[in-house]
Curated annotation (Swiss-Prot):
It holds the Pfam family Conotoxin. The lineage of its organism: Eukaryota, Metazoa, Spiralia, Lophotrochozoa, Mollusca. This is Conotoxin Ar5.1 b. Keywords: Disulfide bond, Neurotoxin, Secreted, Signal, Toxin. Expressed by the venom duct. Residues 20-44 form a propeptide. The cysteine framework is V (CC-CC). Residues 1-19 form the signal peptide. Its main location: secreted. GO terms for cellular component: extracellular region.
């Protein structure tokens, strides 16, 4: 008869619902903040790489145009 109550108590202690709510709340806040920081860093890196690529592509297109015809690089002469 004593086994069943002891088993239930042990089961309740081992269940995830018995965890400390403050600890899980702090952990979830820290995880959310870290994910937001990671998203902001990724956006900045993506935007800077796109802008850098556009400048590089513009230079390549200008060089190709100048090698084909001199009309597009008349401003440089």
């Amino acid at each position: 008869m004593l086994c069943l109550p002891v088993f239930i108590i042990l089961l309740l202690l081992a269940s995830p619902a018995a965890s400390n709510p403050l600890k899980t709340r702090i952990q979830s806040d820290l995880i959310r903040a870290a994910l937001e920081d990671a998203d902001m860093k990724n956006e900045k890196n993506i935007l800077s790489s796109i802008m850098g690529s556009l400048g590089t592509i513009g230079n390549v297109v200008g060089n190709v145009c100048c090698s084909i015809t001199k009309s597009c690089c008349a401003s440089e002469e």
